[in-house]
Each structure stands twice: as C-alpha cells, then as structure tokens.
Amino acid sequence: MAQGTIRFWAAAKAAAGVAEEPYEAETLAAALEAVRTRHPGDLVRVLQRSSFLIDGDPVGTRGHETVRLAEGGTVEVLPPFAGG
C-alpha cells in the first residue's frame, strides 16, 4: 500500500481543519474514502465539487478507482475557486 500526502486547498482546507495529512492507499478512490471517513460533514460536500492533482498531474475525468497512487506521492484537493 502506497503512503504519501494529501494537501487540502481553500474550502477543502477549511472543511478538513488541516492543510495536509498522510494517505495510505493504492488508488485515489481509496484515499478519498478514508478522507470522507475521517472528516464527515462539510468536507464530503467539498470533495464532490473538487478537482484533483496527483503528483502535479490533473486527474480530469478518469475514474478515481483507476488512478494509482505512488509511494511518497502527493494528492492535491482543489475545490472550485471564486473570483477572477
């Protein structure tokens, strides 16, 4: 099982109450399920609207269960940003 870091930005950071936390998961889907378990409530809603970067690469429309996580990797949680 891969271990790495999940970073929360903007509304995701506010909802999680932390800027980052470790993950231990093989896929993005498994990592996000663990996050939902640790942070029920507002963060669950924020995750539904968020986009994700894996080691700097956008996940886009790929199924989260198909996105493999690397040892020492980073998942960035990017909620929609307001403004312009």
Region locations from a protein language model:
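Ubiquitin-like/PB1-type beta-grasp interaction modules and other compact soluble beta-rich domains
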Residues: 1-83
